[in-house]
Swiss-Prot record:
It is an enzyme of class 2 (transferase). It comes from Rhizobium johnstonii (strain DSM 114642 / LMG 32736 / 3841) (Rhizobium leguminosarum bv. viciae). GO terms for molecular function: 4 iron, 4 sulfur cluster binding; lipoate synthase activity; metal ion binding. Its EC number is 2.8.1.8. This is Lipoyl synthase. GO terms for cellular component: cytoplasm. Binds 2 [4Fe-4S] clusters per subunit. One cluster is coordinated with 3 cysteines and an exchangeable S-adenosyl-L-methionine. The lineage of its organism: Bacteria, Pseudomonadati, Pseudomonadota, Alphaproteobacteria, Hyphomicrobiales. Its cofactor is [4Fe-4S] cluster. [4Fe-4S] cluster 1 binds at residues 61, 66, 72, 300. Keywords: 4Fe-4S, Cytoplasm, Iron, Iron-sulfur, Metal-binding, S-adenosyl-L-methionine, Transferase. InterPro entries: Aldolase_TIM (IPR013785), Elp3/MiaA/NifB-like_rSAM (IPR006638), LIAS_N (IPR031691), Lipoyl_synth (IPR003698), rSAM (IPR007197). It catalyses: [[Fe-S] cluster scaffold protein carrying a second [4Fe-4S](2+) cluster] + N(6)-octanoyl-L-lysyl-[protein] + 2 oxidized [2Fe-2S]-[ferredoxin] + 2 S-adenosyl-L-methionine + 4 H(+) = [[Fe-S] cluster scaffold protein] + N(6)-[(R)-dihydrolipoyl]-L-lysyl-[protein] + 4 Fe(3+) + 2 hydrogen sulfide + 2 5'-deoxyadenosine + 2 L-methionine + 2 reduced [2Fe-2S]-[ferredoxin]. It comes from the Bacteria. Belongs to the radical SAM superfamily. Lipoyl synthase family.
Amino acid sequence: MVTILDTINPDAKRVRHPEKAHRPDTEVMRKPDWIRVKAPTSKGYAETRAIVKEHKLVTVCEEAGCPNIGECWDKKHATFMIMGEICTRACAFCNVATGKPNALDMAEPENVAKAVKEMGLSHVVITSVDRDDLEDGGAEHFEKVIWAIRAASPMTTIEILTPDFLKKPGALERVVAAKPDVFNHNMETVPGNYLTVRPGARYFHSVRLLQRVKELDPTMFTKSGIMVGLGEERNEVLQLMDDLRTADVDFLTIGQYLQPTRKHHKVESFVTPDEFKSYETVAYSKGFLMVASSPLTRSSHHAGDDFARLRAAREKKLLMAAE
C-alpha cells in the first residue's frame, strides 16, 4: 500500500516514507572505516548546489542520500533526477519519497539542458523516479530531456538510468530511439531478495529489458548495478552476473548497501574491500567490458571517466576480434 502525500498544500508536513512508518525500527550497524567519507564543504560543492537550485532541479545525489555527493559535486558532477521527487514505488532500500507524484514539469527538459551547459559537463547522467501513474511511464519525458541536452550541448555524452517501464508497452522502444549513449537499468539485488527489497519489480522483467535494449540497438552500451550486504549469498551474485551476460550487458557496478533510516531494510553485512575485488575479477572473467566494484561504488559515480574506459574497452575488443 502507498499512502498518498499532500501535493496540493506545500506547507503541509510531508511524511517521506509513509509506507514504512508502521515497521519496527531495525538495528543500524556501525560502519567500518572503509565506508567513511568527508562532509561536503568545498567551493565546488557549493557552486554545483547553487546551479541545481537555480534551475529548480532534483538530483538523486540528494534524494537518495548518496555518500559520494561531496566528491562528485566538488568536480561539478551531478545526476539529475527527472519527473519529480516522489516515486510511485516503495522499495525497502531507497530513500526517495513515496506517494502520489505531481504533474510533470514541462520546462524541466530545457532546465536540465541549461544546467548541463552551464556546468560544462562532458558526460551527464539522467535518472528518474518510477512513474507508474503515467501511461508511458515517463518515456516521452526522457526523450524530451535527451533531445534538449543534445540541442544545448551537442558534445555531451548522455547516460540514462531508467525505471523498468513495467506494463508500459512501447515505452522502452521510445527511450532507446532517442539514442542515449549509455542505457542503465539497475537490478539492485539478487532475485531471492526481490519480494522484500524490491517488491514492485520483477527480476526477469529487468533482465529482459536490458536484453531488449541490445536487440533494438546493438551499438548502445548497457549497464546495470547491484547492492550487496542485503543478505545475498555469493553464488547468487555470480548467477546474477551470468544472467546479465546472457542479456549482453556491458558494464556492471557493485556497491555496499547503506541503510538510510531505521525503517529501511537493515544492512545484513558489510562486504570487505577484498570481497569486492574478488567480485570484480570474476565479473571480468565472465565477459563484462567494464566492472566497478567497491564499497562506495554507485551507478553514476565516476560515470564520465568510466564511459571513456568503457568505449576504449569495446574498441580494444573489436580490434582483437579483427586480428
